[in-house]
Design a protein with these regions (language model features):
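Compositionally biased, intrinsically disordered low-complexity regions enriched in proline and serine
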Residues: 8-10, 20, 255
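Bacterial N-terminal signal peptides that target proteins for export
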Residues: 2-15
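Bacterial N-terminal signal peptides
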Residues: 14-24
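Acidic/polar surface patches and capping/hinge elements
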Residues: 27-454
Length: 454
C-alpha cells in the first residue's frame, strides 16, 4: 500500500483555520440514524441532563422569514463555507482541524498538550452531545424549514433527521469549546470558526436559527462537563522519577512525556495494565542495525512516518472508510467511531509512557555512539516500546473491529509504521514488535469495554 501517495495533502496549523472558512468540497448524501436514547454516554449520567429550550412554534413564521433572508444574502464565500462544513458527518471537519492543531504541539512545552490528547476529549464531547441531540430530536419532532415552506430550496441535501437541535451546531459547540480550552492562544479563532460552521446550516436552508442557537448551547454545556472531567484525569505534577545512570539504559536531559504516566486512564484499570516484560539486551540488535542496508522504499517509509504524528494518517483513513461504506451521513455512528479511536489513543499514550519510564530502554544512538539515525534525530524519551508501533496497533485493532473486512490492510499499515522506526535508525526490532503486540491487546480491551456501552 502506497500510504505516501494516499495521504498527500497536509496543511499548516494557522493556514488550516483560514482554509476551513473558504474551501468547498461536496459528497453524496445518505440518510442517517436518528436514535441516541439507547447509547450510553461518557460524562452525562443521562442524555436529558443537558437542557435546552423547547422550540417556540409562535416564532415559526418569523424564523422562516429569517431563513429566507439569510439565504438571499449568500455570497460565493458563503456557498463555499456551506459546502465545506456539509462534507461528511459533523465531526469529520473537526477531526481534521484537531489533528493539525495537536500534531503541531509535540515540540511545544515538552509536548504537554500533545500528550494530553485534545482529540480524545473533543470526540467524547461530540459523542455525548450528539446522543443528547438525537434524543431531543425525537422528543420535539420539529420539521425542517423547507418541509414547512415549499418555497425554500436548500443549498445542500438535508440530513434525514428532525430539525431541532442542529447536529452541526451541537458538534461545533462541543468541538470548538473543548479545543479552545486546550489551545487558549487561538481560542477566539476556534470559537469564531465554530459559530461559522453552525450558522452555515441556516444559510443552507436546512435549519431554523433556533435549531442552531440551542444546538450550540447544548454542545457547549457538554463540552464544559468534558473539560471538568479532563482536569481530574490530566494530573500535571513534576516528575519525581530517577533515571538510571549506567550505559545500558536511556538517559536524557529531560524526561519528555513522563507526565503522561500520571494521567488517569479512561478505560484501563491502571497505567501499567498492559506493561510488557522487560526488554532484552540490545547488543545483537545493534549489530543488525549496523549491518542494515537502506533502499529507496525503506528510506521513504522512515521519512514518511517520521513526518507525521500518526493522528493525521489514522484519522484520514478512518474518515475515508466512513465515506467508502456510506456511513458519513450517520452522525451518531461517525461520532462513535472517532470517540472509540481517540480514547484508544489516549489509553495508548499512558501505556506507552508507563513502559518507557519503567524500563528506560536505550536508543540505538546511545548504545552505539557512532550510530547516526537516518532521519537526523532521536525522540527525547526512552525507546522501549515504540510509541508509533503501539499507538498504530491500537488504532488498527479498533478499526479492524469496526471494519472487519479491512483488517488485513489496517494491520499491514500498523506494521509498516512499526518497521519504519527501525529503518529510521531510532528503534530496535524488539521495540517495534513488542509495541505492536501490546497495542493489539490494548486495542481489543478498549473496544470490548466501550463497545458494550456505546
Amino acid at each position: 500500500m502506497n500510504t505516501n501517495s494516499f495521504y498527500s495533502q497536509k496543511f499548516a496549523v494557522v493556514p488550516m483555520l483560514v482554509f476551513c472558512l473558504t474551501l468547498s468540497i461536496g459528497f453524496a448524501q445518505h440518510p442517517e440514524s436518528a436514535r441516541g436514547d439507547k447509547s450510553q454516554t461518557f460524562v452525562l449520567a443521562d442524555s436529558r441532563e443537558v437542557k435546552i429550550a423547547t422550540p417556540d412554534n409562535k416564532l415559526l413564521q418569523r424564523e422562516l422569514a429569517q431563513v429566507k433572508e439569510k439565504m438571499s444574502k449568500n455570497t460565493p464565500a458563503d456557498s463555499q463555507r456551506i459546502s465545506y462544513w456539509d462534507a461528511g458527518a459533523p465531526a469529520y471537519r473537526w477531526n481534521q482541524i484537531a489533528y493539525q492543531l495537536t500534531g503541531a504541539q509535540f515540540e511545544v512545552n515538552n509536548g504537554l498538550t500533545f500528550f494530553k490528547s485534545p482529540m480524545t476529549w473533543m470526540n467524547m464531547a461530540i459523542y455525548d452531545a450528539t446522543v443528547a441531540a438525537m434524543d431531543i430530536k425525537q422528543q420535539t419532532s420539529r420539521k425542517r424549514p423547507f418541509e414547512i415552506d415549499k418555497s425554500i430550496k436548500t443549498v445542500v441535501a438535508a440530513p434525514a433527521t428532525y430539525s431541532y437541535p442542529c447536529e452541526h451546531a451541537v458538534t461545533a459547540g462541543a468541538a470548538a469549546t473543548v479545543l479552545a480550552y486546550f489551545f487558549p492562544e487561538i481560542a477566539d479563532s476556534l470559537l469564531t470558526l465554530g459559530k461559522g460552521a453552525a450558522e452555515s446550516r441556516v444559510a443552507a436552508g436546512v435549519q431554523f436559527p433556533s435549531d442552531v442557537a440551542e444546538g450550540w448551547k447544548l454542545g457547549e454545556q457538554v463540552a464544559a462537563k468534558v473539560i471538568e472531567k479532563s482536569k481530574n484525569h490530566l494530573t500535571v505534577m513534576p516528575w519525581n522519577g530517577k533515571q538510571p545512570s549506567d550505559a545500558k539504559h536511556w538517559r536524557g536531559p529531560y524526561p519528555v512525556g513522563a507526565v503522561a504516566t500520571m494521567f488517569k486512564p479512561l478505560v484501563m484499570k491502571s497505567g501499567d495494565q498492559f506493561r510488557p516484560a522487560a526488554p532484552p539486551d540490545f547488543t545483537k540488535e545493534m549489530e543488525q542495525m549496523n549491518n542494515f542496508k537502506q533502499n529507496f522504499y525503506t528510506a521513504s517509509q522512515a521519512y514518511y512516518w517520521a513526518a507525521h504524528s500518526g493522528l493525521d494518517i489514522w484519522t484520514d483513513l478512518a474518515s475515508s472508510k466512513m465515506f467508502e461504506y456510506h456511513m458519513d451521513r450517520n452522525t451518531l455512528e461517525c461520532a462513535r467511531i472517532y470517540a472509540l479511536m481517540n480514547i484508544g489513543l489516549y489509553e495508548a499514550v499512558i501505556a506507552i509512557m508507563d513502559a518507557k519510564y519503567a524500563y528506560f530502554g536505550i536508543r540505538p544512538d546511545q548504545l552505539n555512539l557512532d550510530h547516526k539515525p537516518l532521519i537526523g534525530y532521536t525522540p527525547p524519551f526512552p525507546g522501549y516500546p515504540s510509541g508509533h508501533a503501539m499507538a498504530s496497533s491500537v488504532v488498527a485493532t479498533i478499526l479492524s473491529r469496526i471494519f472487519p473486512q479491512d483488517e488485513a490492510m489496517f494491520k499491514q499499515l500498523a506494521k509498516e509504521c512499526a518497521d519504519s522506526r527501525f529503518y529510521a535508525g531510532i528503534h530496535f526490532p524488539t521495540d517495534n514488535n513488542v509495541g505492536l503486540d501490546a497495542g493489539e491487546k490494548l486495542g481489543n480491551y478498549v473496544f470490548a469495554t466501550l463497545n458494550k456501552q456505546m
